[in-house]
Amino acid sequence: MPSAGSVNAANPAVDTSAQTGRYDPTALEQRWQESWKADGVDTTEVGGEKPGFFALSMFPYPSGSLHMGHVRNYVITDVIARVQRMLGHAVLHPMGWDAFGLPAENAAIERNVDPGEWTDRNIDQMRAQLDRLGLSIDWSREQATCHSDYYRWTQWLFLELLEGGLAYRKNATVNWDPVDQTVLANEQVDGDGRSWRSGALVEQRQLNQWFLRITDYAEPLLNDLDALKGWPERVRTMQANWIGRSEGAEISFNVEGAQNQTITVFTTRPDTLAGASYVVLAPENELVDSLSSEEQKDTVEAFRKEVARLSTIERTCDDRPKRGVPIGSHVINPLTGVVLPVWIADYVLAEYGTGAVMGVPAHDQRDIAFAQSNGLPIQQVIDAEGAAEAIAAGQAWTDAGTLVNSGSFDGTASSEAKGAITGHGAEQGWARSKVTYRLRDWLISRQRYWGCPIPVIHCDNCGAVPVPREDLPVELPRGIDLSGKGGSPLSQQSDWVNVACPRCGKPAKRETDTMDTFMCSSWYFLRFADPHNTEKPFSKEAVNRWLPVKQYVGGIEHAILHLLYARFFTKALKDRGLIDINEPFERLLTQGMVQGVTYRNATTGKYIAPADVADAEDPRDPNTGDKLEVLFEKMSKSKYNGVDPAAVIDRYGADTARMFILFKAPPEKDLEWDDADVEGQFRFLQRLWRLVEAGSARIDSLEPMQRPADLSDADSDVRRALHLAIEAVSEDLSDEIQLNTAISELMKLSNAISSTGIDALSAPVLQEALSGLVRLLAPFAPHLAEEFWNRLGGSGSVHRQSWPVLDPTALVQDSVEVVIQVKGKVRGKLQVPASAGKEELERLALASDVAEKWLEGAAPRRVIVVPGKLVNLVP
């Protein structure tokens, strides 16, 4: 760590001889952290009449190692929590651990350790790392989703949803590893469709699994986005697109030669019905077996096996060629009577819509590519200028126009034809208006061990029976062998699986799937309001006291799944009468990534560690001599651009790390790590140290003092600087949270005090200025602010003080500085009375040395005056 003596003093007016010690953040920060713990400074105020403020960071997976992305998230939330506490709120600022999931299970398999022990050890490590940051977290409310006293209530809430008809079982497709005989998560399948562990080609299989009916809430989830004014527009748009409301029609095509058998499709373009030249079923559609002809059955079956190896992402990728085969059946277009072939294709999914689509090649780009590949007809039915030429060139016409080749609907505008054709079909019984959503029901089953057990028992006599609530939690068996092979690990634990049915008493088996980890994170914020309740997951009274979360902070990567599931849970639990709130998070801040510099060989694609780059000005690959690309990218081990928070804290202290990460970029923008800027923040804190040391020589108490009736110019200037800072920092920390500009204001204030000089100020104004500066600093650099408060004679903790109050009278100036321009170029500045009007400003400007020099005695043709700002003289 650089010594204070090695840094130039920025402000010579500061009397550095008054220093009594060197800024040593390591000892100072540890001392104050221990003091805060002993005094319970960060404990949530439960009683009293203060309004509540719930500040929450998205809780982390306990990997065991804190990274700079974590630091940024938690420090931003901490500043908000500290400010709100000083503004008079009772603040709830808790922390927990999203502790179930695949990484711990994989680590257990690879290292032959118990995932619970592995996770608890990681939690202890990360808690200690978080403590070093000086976060004002109430650790008495800590929760870990893998502990049974938490997942007992996850199971309890699952039973609530089951009783409410929101949880159910059905068959669904999973990734199946045929070698290890187990189900794989999507992230365990590589880009070539192979298992990450065995290397086998992954197959798609149907398994009976648990779902939640999130689609029942599609409409309120979409409509209520409008009420989330405190959320980024980008996130609201992403959720709206994910929910994906579509208005259209369901149209039924009669199967040729089959009485009372139809294929129903959903389309948003019923106006193009006459242009349909084929119908496509998903390979998994149950109609395929009955509609496939004898001649095509072998071809169909072979194709279905090929498709079973593809992931959903591969099947729906726009860039991938669409493949299919005819099944040997035909349907009749209900509008035109034309007979159309039925195909199966890889791009149609059984779980979307009806599992069937009509192909209209002339007016859908995917359909035209499929038709051209398979020799299917392309019939234009929407005409507009340029439409025929586009279709002839292989580009589908997807815009509006006028109907052609559509019988009695020819000449109708496509916008009108949508309703007209749907209405015509409704009268004849083959169409109906329909609103659909892209959103699918939430599949929560996971064939893994390290997750929350699903509290259901399967009985041959009674079916799926909920575990009685008094028997919760259904605990995971510990100390079992995890090989990663042979299906669900729980299914192999016979002592755990085999139980008596709670309803009839006959032999039965436990559900061996565990829950998606998003189940645990969809309600954890509610538990924080009432963490020690042993009778229920939370009381309605506690939730009403603290919820909704006033400020939620986390990454944009959670914009859809976590945030959508949390909103669904909140609405569902409200409908069950458990809570009164309709939305969980009032305001949302999605912080940008922390990026580090990378060196990449564009030829080989390999990243080079900075330590191996000899010359940063001319970076080259040490092995090939190739010139390296220099980029800023998200920090990762594979790119050699990570920065260990512990190393930064060891060298500079937590306050410097906090100040840098808050100052370098606006919270929502990506942050580029720069060691020089870290050093710059350390130097700023050293300057503050010297400033307060000098001030403490004149002040031994922060009890308010009576200001003189007549202030000196120095006193007035510093008071104005102080209250300008109070006004600006308060604004920066209100609706639009701009922490970087708030720190800039602190720098301006410290410079104003230093440049004026400690000895030039009266004791009351010096006291007011330093008291205000330290309190404004407290949320950003809590340890140093506490030290300053103590050294200046403040009583109690600075973090229990009130936020500085703006005095508008301090902002009033007797004089102001205006800019003098000649022909629009700045040529000088002039001190003028603050009350000077246009005529007075013009007179003073013309009488100034600037006018004499640049006008050379000539009268200007024009004088432009902006009161209090500038005078522009135009010769």
UniProtKB/Swiss-Prot annotation:
GO cellular component, one term: cytosol
MF annotations from Gene Ontology: aminoacyl-tRNA deacylase activity; ATP binding; leucine-tRNA ligase activity
EC class: ligase
Encoding gene per record: leuS
Binding residue positions for ATP: 637
Keyword terms of this UniProt record: Aminoacyl-tRNA synthetase, ATP-binding, Cytoplasm, Ligase, Nucleotide-binding, Protein biosynthesis
GO biological process annotation, one example: leucyl-tRNA aminoacylation
Highest taxon in the source lineage: Bacteria
Family classification: Belongs to the class-I aminoacyl-tRNA synthetase family.
SUPFAM superfamilies: Anticodon-binding domain of a subclass of class I aminoacyl-tRNA synthetases, Nucleotidylyl transferase, ValRS/IleRS/LeuRS editing domain
Organism: Synechococcus sp. (strain CC9605)
Compartment list: Cytoplasm
Major subcellular site: cytoplasm
Chain positions covered by the region annotation Disordered: 1-22
Keyword Aminoacyl-tRNA synthetase: yes
Motif 'HIGH' region in this chain: 60-70
Motif interval(s): 'KMSKS' region: 634-638
Gene3D superfamilies documented for this protein: HUPs, Isoleucyl-tRNA Synthetase, Domain 1
Enzyme nomenclature, EC number: 6.1.1.4
One Pfam family in the UniProt entry: tRNA-synt_1
Start-end of Polar residues biased regions: 1-20
Name of the molecule in the record: Leucine--tRNA ligase
Catalytic activity line of the entry: tRNA(Leu) + L-leucine + ATP = L-leucyl-tRNA(Leu) + AMP + diphosphate
